[in-house]
Amino acid sequence: MSSIDKRIKEIVAEQLGVDEGQVTNEASFMDDLGADSLDTVELVMALEEEFDIEISDEDAEKIQSVQDAIDYITDHT
């Protein structure tokens, strides 16, 4: 696991208040980790801050799972 993957999983666990063991690459923020729409907005903001990037609203809507976040961050950093 790359350091980006690990850091994203740590942020997801922290933001959503779940155990890191639940944060798998396939985990959907809403379906598997219990996030609501506000949680996902806050999660995107935390990722923007951590990786010093700006995620457009259009792109943010496409980030639905841990793997989506990893792919986006990897492609944009």
Curated annotation (Swiss-Prot):
Pfam families in UniProt: PP-binding (PF00550)
GO process terms (BP): lipid A biosynthetic process
Matches recorded under InterPro entries: ACP, ACP-like_sf, PP-bd_ACP, Ppantetheine_attach_site
Post-translational modification summary for this protein: 4'-phosphopantetheine is transferred from CoA to a specific serine of apo-ACP by AcpS. This modification is essential for activity because fatty acids are bound in thioester linkage to the sulfhydryl of the prosthetic group.
Keyword Cytoplasm: yes
Keyword terms: Cytoplasm, Fatty acid biosynthesis, Fatty acid metabolism, Lipid biosynthesis, Lipid metabolism, Phosphopantetheine, Phosphoprotein
Domain Carrier: 2-77
Subcellular location: Cytoplasm
O-(pantetheine 4'-phosphoryl)serine carried by residues: S37
Associated pathway: Lipid metabolism; fatty acid biosynthesis
Molecular function terms, GO-annotated: acyl binding; acyl carrier activity
Superkingdom, taxonomy of origin: Bacteria
Entry GO CC: cytosol; membrane
Keyword flag Phosphoprotein: yes
Entry similarity comment: Belongs to the acyl carrier protein (ACP) family.
Function, as annotated: Carrier of the growing fatty acid chain in fatty acid biosynthesis.
HAMAP family (alphabetical): Acyl_carrier
Protein name stated in the entry: Acyl carrier protein
